Amino acid sequence: MLLVLIDVDGFMGQLYNENGTQTILIPREAVIFYWEKNTAFNILQLFFHGGIDTIFEKTNQRSFSFQSRHIHHFTLDESPLPNSITLPTDTLQAFKACKKIIFQHLVKITKDHEQILLLHKGGPEGEWVRSFNIPNATVQNLNDLCCPSVEKLVLKKKDYISSSIGCPKHIQGSNHCPIFECHVLFKWIQENTFIAQGVLERSSLSYEEAVLFIEHRINMVDNHPFKKDSIKQNQKKKNWIATQFVQHGIYVDNGILTKIYNKYSLF
């Protein structure tokens, strides 16, 4: 089985045209991280340049500035690397072109494999790879396994992965380089998951352990919906319980989660 982890970084914004409003991502970097069980990984790294026309830039100026400073550390006017792929000047055409390029590379990487698992962690990548309909491929979101954020994984274990791993596009040691993120997520996958019936699985917390955790959170957190004893609060309570597990990177399967809801009469 071939496992493929995809991460794409770039400028995300609103595109307005005759079809209405569309949220699109114009990549600056894409990483395809792939391996088979018990084998070394391979990395395909793609750099992109251009593709952001004047109208798209002006419409999303404030958002792009925030993304540059706080998310990926790309700049709109940076010089392209020698191996960068130049995108069309029209933003919509650039969006279609970069998706096509990533699709073609995925097809090339996966074409000789009978079973493929395409992995992503949130973001637009999931929508992209699902739309590609790669033969013999299943798409899975790591967030569905309560995979912690890269920042949390790195903070939890300072030596989790070397901060020197990255590329020239980012500030040295930045946690937002796709190369760095894929290394961190690959290590988390290796340490916390197993393959069952063609997808990644995680061992669930037991019902007893899950209840103890929720009771602990109720006692520790000041602002929670259990302070109000009202049926109207039931959905908020269910959302709060699920969020506690996700925020702490704890995986609980749906059967146990349902039992916990029943314990608190959250029907």
UniProtKB/Swiss-Prot annotation:
Keywords per UniProt: Early protein, Host-virus interaction, Inhibition of host innate immune response by virus, Inhibition of host RIG-I by virus, Inhibition of host RLR pathway by virus, Viral immunoevasion
Gene Ontology biological process terms, A to Z: symbiont-mediated suppression of host cytoplasmic pattern recognition receptor signaling pathway via inhibition of RIG-I activity
Induction / repression: Expressed in the early phase of the viral replicative cycle.
Family to which this protein belongs: Belongs to the asfivirus I267L family.
Protein name (Swiss-Prot/TrEMBL): Protein I267L
